[in-house]
Amino acid sequence: MISYGENLGGRAVSPLPVRGGHMMHGAAFAYVPSPQVLHRIPGTSAYGFPSVGPMALPEHGCPYGEVVEHHDPLPAKLALEDERKPEPGLIQKLRRAGVTLLKVPLMLSFLYLFVCSLDVLSSAFQLAGGKVAGDIFKDNAILSNPVAGLVVGILVTVLVQSSSTSTSIVVSMVSSGLLEVSSAIPIIMGSNIGTSVTNTIVALMQAGDRTDFRRAFAGATVHDCFNWLSVLVLLPLEAATGYLHHITRLVVASFNIRGGRDAPDLLKIITEPFTKLIIQLDKSVITSLASGDESLRNHSLIRVWCYPNPTEVPTPMPRAEANTSRMLRNATLEKCNHIFVDTGLPDLAVGLILLAGSLALLCTCLILLVKMLNSLLKGQVAKVIQKVINTDFPTPFTWATGYFAMVVGASMTFVVQSSSVFTSAITPLIGLGVISIERAYPLTLGSNIGTTTTAILAALASPREKLSSAFQIALCHFFFNISGILLWYPVPCTRLPIRMAKALGKRTAKYRWFAVLYLLLCFLLLPSMVFGLSMAGWRAMVGVGAPFGALLAFVVLVSALQHRSPGCLPKWLQTWDFLPLWVHSLKPLDHLITRATLCCARPEPRSPPLPTRVFLEELPPATPSPRLAMPHHHDATRL
């Protein structure tokens, strides 16, 4: 009996029908299993065994025992469904069609509950930290510092889980004269960073499968990387030149802007009937505290009294246990109809309850959504959807594909009125491999643009005497995102967020606890540390920040040279092996965390060490793809 490799005309080439130029070689793969026994081999679900491409590629020193994987967003577990199967009968076809038709409304229901859970999660964070956010905004001396303003924008948006809420607070403070436009611009930049924490949390729910987790986390953090890189360039530029302030002032002065209606709540029309039964908040309390109005200090954020006419604006009132309706300023107030209207619990307790419940609902809906999508997107269906989403325009207009994706992302975000909802909704699709990270990047950039249109429309609803300043700060948000796109998208070599996100995804797939560390570090610990240094004065900021920044720049430069041109470096600097292991590797920390978390667990039998996975997009430029080649003594086993 001949081996599979000889049957295919090559050496140890797997027959599985997975797309892409994947290769495997080495002694560990001397025997290639057939598809019928593949599912019985432990750990094979994470591997795709594609065939070698038709082009003959030269050797490039690929050591034995490595798996070289070319980028292909369609995962192996979906592509395996394309195997030849016997033709099903009529009854089986009808049964499959019925099950599919039943899955579609179920999937839409889970998607609806997923979006509602994001809304309730935002309310929970506002109950737990909304007053703290209002107090942070109150100190104008702090906000006059650009770095402190940036950190305030990050922390407040993380606390309230809504960039729309934090931006509306800033707009109201600017329009009331409590905050200058120049001081509000760094806060807007910070809110742009803080809003990306939601889809990063959503990506954590796919940590069960390392391959899916790698893609999902990379797709979520590409938003973070873009925002952080944009701030690192544009915040010093704005502090030195004030270009955003000057451009937006010219735009406002050039147009005869008139006040209009409020921003349309297209998605809330669908979600509010459900979320209003759970909780209703009086967000004017946060805005009043930020404006310095201490009369509402002891007022609860939980709304108890509501106007039956939705066009009327309710007046903040303390909780009351009296009648179900009362008269105030010739208007009838009725008790609101939600779960926590008469509980008497403090805001913090209600916020923690809602936080736990919304996270549980979010996790459940996301897991069920992923399973539904996995069952629906099989074989040819997955290939068609993947091809439609990830295929570029014809050759003369290939460059326009990404910009069209930006328009789609902006339009969808305008419809759902939330960039967090849109990016969180596409994160599971990125994890499944239906949307590639290269396509998710322009979609995310378009989402950044779409969320600014909501702020612009909200500013147009301001009173005439406050319209100019409110519209100017909303335009600052818009031009900040446009500037970031001009920096990090038009030229392919400047698309650093994609490479950074892929590196983060690869790291988190290897050490899954790193995702939690990343969240704490980027959205809590690092902003808090920078905020403390900025409050200590510019001398402390420069004294600590300058050496740290120089060290970081040196490490980034040397790492890039080690990857691209190691010959340019001294021999001792071509690797970081001269440093202690804990300085340049996460293995010691991973060992400690593993021992701490599994000390009471029953040890499982360890499988043989898996081969190293090398991704072609991480090889230096102009590097030919390693082709399958073995010495004669490593030939495939004959059965």
Curated annotation (Swiss-Prot):
<dbReference type="GO" id="GO:0030643">
    <property type="term" value="P:intracellular phosphate ion homeostasis"/>
</dbReference>
<feature type="topological domain" description="Cytoplasmic">
    <location>
        <begin position="371"/>
        <end position="412"/>
    </location>
</feature>
<keyword id="KW-0915">Sodium</keyword>
<feature type="topological domain" description="Extracellular">
    <location>
        <begin position="186"/>
        <end position="347"/>
    </location>
</feature>
<keyword id="KW-0769">Symport</keyword>
<feature type="transmembrane region" description="Helical; Name=M5">
    <location>
        <begin position="413"/>
        <end position="436"/>
    </location>
</feature>
<dbReference type="GO" id="GO:0005436">
    <property type="term" value="F:sodium:phosphate symporter activity"/>
</dbReference>
<keyword id="KW-1015">Disulfide bond</keyword>
<feature type="glycosylation site" description="N-linked (GlcNAc...) asparagine">
    <location>
        <position position="323"/>
    </location>
</feature>
<feature type="transmembrane region" description="Helical; Name=M1">
    <location>
        <begin position="104"/>
        <end position="125"/>
    </location>
</feature>
<protein>
    <recommendedName>
        <fullName>Sodium-dependent phosphate transport protein 2A</fullName>
    </recommendedName>
</protein>
<dbReference type="GO" id="GO:0016324">
    <property type="term" value="C:apical plasma membrane"/>
</dbReference>
<dbReference type="GO" id="GO:0005886">
    <property type="term" value="C:plasma membrane"/>
</dbReference>
<feature type="transmembrane region" description="Helical; Name=M7">
    <location>
        <begin position="514"/>
        <end position="534"/>
    </location>
</feature>
<keyword id="KW-1003">Cell membrane</keyword>
<feature type="transmembrane region" description="Helical; Name=M6">
    <location>
        <begin position="467"/>
        <end position="487"/>
    </location>
</feature>
<feature type="topological domain" description="Cytoplasmic">
    <location>
        <begin position="164"/>
        <end position="165"/>
    </location>
</feature>
<dbReference type="GO" id="GO:0006817">
    <property type="term" value="P:phosphate ion transport"/>
</dbReference>
<feature type="transmembrane region" description="Helical; Name=M8">
    <location>
        <begin position="540"/>
        <end position="561"/>
    </location>
</feature>
<feature type="glycosylation site" description="N-linked (GlcNAc...) asparagine">
    <location>
        <position position="298"/>
    </location>
</feature>
<feature type="glycosylation site" description="N-linked (GlcNAc...) asparagine">
    <location>
        <position position="330"/>
    </location>
</feature>
<keyword id="KW-0472">Membrane</keyword>
<comment type="function">
    <text>Involved in actively transporting phosphate into cells via Na(+) cotransport in the renal brush border membrane. The cotransport has a Na(+):Pi stoichiometry of 3:1 and is electrogenic.</text>
</comment>
<feature type="modified residue" description="Phosphoserine">
    <location>
        <position position="14"/>
    </location>
</feature>
<feature type="topological domain" description="Cytoplasmic">
    <location>
        <begin position="562"/>
        <end position="639"/>
    </location>
</feature>
<comment type="similarity">
    <text>Belongs to the SLC34A transporter family.</text>
</comment>
<feature type="modified residue" description="Phosphothreonine">
    <location>
        <position position="623"/>
    </location>
</feature>
<keyword id="KW-1133">Transmembrane helix</keyword>
<dbReference type="Pfam" id="PF02690">
    <property type="entry name" value="Na_Pi_cotrans"/>
</dbReference>
<feature type="topological domain" description="Cytoplasmic">
    <location>
        <begin position="1"/>
        <end position="103"/>
    </location>
</feature>
<keyword id="KW-0739">Sodium transport</keyword>
<feature type="topological domain" description="Extracellular">
    <location>
        <begin position="437"/>
        <end position="466"/>
    </location>
</feature>
<feature type="disulfide bond">
    <location>
        <begin position="225"/>
        <end position="522"/>
    </location>
</feature>
<feature type="topological domain" description="Extracellular">
    <location>
        <begin position="126"/>
        <end position="145"/>
    </location>
</feature>
<feature type="modified residue" description="Phosphoserine">
    <location>
        <position position="607"/>
    </location>
</feature>
<keyword id="KW-0406">Ion transport</keyword>
<keyword id="KW-0597">Phosphoprotein</keyword>
<dbReference type="GO" id="GO:0055062">
    <property type="term" value="P:phosphate ion homeostasis"/>
</dbReference>
<keyword id="KW-0813">Transport</keyword>
<comment type="subunit">
    <text>Interacts via its C-terminal region with NHERF4. Interacts with NHERF1. Interacts with TMEM174; regulates SLC34A1 internalization by PTH and FGF23.</text>
</comment>
<feature type="modified residue" description="Phosphoserine">
    <location>
        <position position="625"/>
    </location>
</feature>
<feature type="transmembrane region" description="Helical; Name=M3">
    <location>
        <begin position="166"/>
        <end position="185"/>
    </location>
</feature>
